[in-house]
Amino acid sequence: LTCFNDFSPTAHTVEDCQRGITTCYMKTWRVHRETVIERGCGCPKVKPGIRLKCCTGNTCNY
């Protein structure tokens, strides 16, 4: 599985996930009126106030 793995609004870099990982994620949250975006492999638990989207399929976390 290949997922985007960067911290910007436009996804540019990718990573090959470790064997056995079947999902990609995109987390978003607000900091001082700006939206922060984090992408990567897996589907992590998040704190309240953080939006999480998990998906299956190569580069689905755009």
Curated annotation (Swiss-Prot):
GO MF term list: acetylcholine receptor inhibitor activity; ion channel regulator activity; toxin activity
Superkingdom of origin organism: Eukaryota
A GO term from the CC aspect: extracellular region
CDD domains with a match to the protein in the record: TFP_snake_toxin (cd00206)
Tissues showing expression: Expressed by the venom gland.
Disulfide bonds: C3-C24, C17-C41, C43-C54, C55-C60
Subcellular location field: Secreted
Statement: the UniProt record of this protein carries the keyword Disulfide bond: yes
SUPFAM superfamilies registered for this protein in UniProt: Snake toxin-like
Primary localisation category: secreted
Keyword annotations of the record: Acetylcholine receptor inhibiting toxin, Disulfide bond, Ion channel impairing toxin, Neurotoxin, Postsynaptic neurotoxin, Secreted, Toxin
Family note: Belongs to the three-finger toxin family. Short-chain subfamily. Type I alpha-neurotoxin sub-subfamily.
Function: Binds to muscle nicotinic acetylcholine receptor (nAChR) and inhibit acetylcholine from binding to the receptor, thereby impairing neuromuscular transmission.
Protein name in UniProt: Frontoxin III
Organism the protein comes from: Micrurus frontalis
